Structure formats: C-alpha cells, structure tokens
UniProtKB/Swiss-Prot annotation:
The keyword Coiled coil applies. InterPro entries: Myb_DNA-bind_5 (IPR028002). Keywords: Coiled coil, Isopeptide bond, Phosphoprotein, Ubl conjugation. It comes from Bos taurus. This is Myb/SANT-like DNA-binding domain-containing protein 3.
Length: 275
C-alpha cells in the first residue's frame, strides 16, 4: 500500500464500534437526549457530538468517523430499538412473546434505559374484559382475617342505612374488594410519584451536565487565550532579539571599519616636536 493512499472509513459499524458509541452516548445522554429545542441547547448538543466524535476517534481499533456519522448511527440504533420494544409490547399483550427479538439489537436494555418511555411504548389494541367472578375476587390478595377487615370497613366504604328497614350489613368480601381497589389506586399513585421524581432527577442531571460542559468550554477558551498570549509574547521576544542582534552586528562592523582606518600602531607614534 502506498503511503499517499487515502484510507476510507468502513461503511458499516462493527459491534465493537457500536459498543464504544453506546458507552459514549450513555456518558453524555443527559445532554444528547435533552428534550429542549431552543437554539442554545441545539448548539450545545452539536458541540457535545463533536467532543464525542473526538473522544471516539481517539479509541484504538476504530475507523475515523465524523460527528454526523456517529449521530446517524445512534439515531438508527434508537429507531430499531423503539420498533423492537413496541413489537415486544404488542406481543406481551397477545400473550405470545417471541424470544428471538432480544438478540436483534446490541444492548437493547441499555439503549432502552437511555430513551424516554413514551417513545417506544405504542398504544396496544384493546382486549375484551374478562367476566367478573365474585368468588375469584374474594380470594385475591390481602390475606388478613375477616375480623380485621370488618373492623376497618368504615375506613374504606360507607353504606347508608335507612330507618325502619332491616338491611343486611356488608359482607367482608365486599370490603375486601374495596380495599383491594384502594390498594391498587395507592400503588398507582406511588408509581406515578416515583416516576415524577425520576424525571425531576434526570432533568437536574441534564442541567448539571450542561453546566459542566459550559464550564469546560470556558476553561478551554481560557487555555487557548493564554496560549495565544504566550505565542504573542514569544513572537515579540523573537523580534526584539533580532533587532538587538542586528544592532550588535552593526556596531561590530563599525568597529572593524574604525580599526582598519585607525590602526592601533598609529597611536603609538611619537608626536613631532613642537617649535
């Protein structure tokens, strides 16, 4: 192979290159996957992709890529992962999950953790609601005694009693059903609260990472300014040294000329006698 031959990058990403790209994207995910779309965030994302490309190309055993190629590869991986996750969700609804789907994408769980949940969760087709069986509902969770449920039934359900009528008191199975509904509602509320806290934490992490990148940019700008000042000082010192060397050479040549015109022996001659 000749030395002047240009080596073109490989057309497709290898598995090693994809794993390196995923590791770098996970490092900067709070910036690259930020939902903000203002001009400042877009410019910051582009600078982050450029920094990611520089860090990617510094890795051994990878082909040289620019940030546009890396960004396109990440978008393709995201689209493929979202499609597979949506298909798996539909298959789970149909109770027939295919085990072969989990091998199509490298690190599917890792990629899914970097994507917002609403991106790949598609709306599943509605299913027919199963018939309600009172006996099965009575045998659900909450393995507590009937006395405990009946003692606490006022906390869950209230039945109005009309005067002059003899209505039977509610059974413990009805109280159990109501308690189960309240438990499920409480569980869903706790899940929503936990999800809200996680989103808030992710937003805070995104803001901190943006601030870190901005501080890094300011630090790099200061270093570049100091380097430029050092270069200017070195250039000024070089010019001054050249001027001094020229002056030195000038006076050396002048001294040589003076020595030739006025040799030292002429000063040793005796002066003529004065009249």
């Amino acid at each position: 192979m000749q030395n002047n031959e240009i080596i073109k990058p490989a057309k497709y990403f290898s598995e090693l290159e994809k794993s390196i790209l995923l590791a770098l994207v996970e490092k900067y995910k709070y910036v690259l996957e930020c939902k903000k779309s203002d001009a400042r965030t877009i410019a910051l994302k582009q600078r982050t992709w450029q920094a990611l490309a520089h860090e990617y190309n510094s890795q051994p055993s990878v082909s040289l890529r620019d940030f546009k190629q890396l960004k396109k590869c990440w978008e393709n991986i995201k689209a493929r992962t979202k499609k597979i996750m949506a298909h798996e969700r539909r298959e789970k609804v149909k109770r027939s999950v295919s085990p072969l789907l989990s091998t199509h994408v490298l690190g599917k769980e890792k990629i899914a953790s970097m994507l917002p949940e609403q991106l790949y969760f598609l709306q599943s087709p509605p299913e027919e609601e199963p018939e309600y069986h009172a006996e099965a509902a009575a045998q659900e969770s909450f393995a507590v005694s009937n006395r405990e449920l009946c003692d606490d039934e006022k906390e869950f359900i209230h039945f109005p009693v009309c005067e002059g009528t003899s209505q039977p008191e509610p059974s413990c199975s009805a109280v159990r059903i109501t308690a189960n509904k309240n438990y499920r509602s409480k569980t869903s509320q706790e899940g929503a609260l936990k999800k809200m806290h996680e989103e808030e934490h992710h937003q805070q992490m995104s803001i901190l990472q943006l601030q870190l990148i901005q501080m890094n940019e300011v630090h790099v700008a200061k270093i570049q300014q100091i380097e430029r000042e050092c270069e200017m000082a070195e250039e000024e010192h070089r010019i001054k040294m050249e001027v001094l060397n020229k002056k030195k050479m000038y006076w050396e040549r002048k001294l040589q000329t003076f020595t030739k015109e006025w040799p030292v022996s002429s000063f040793n001659r005796p002066f003529p006698n004065s009249p």
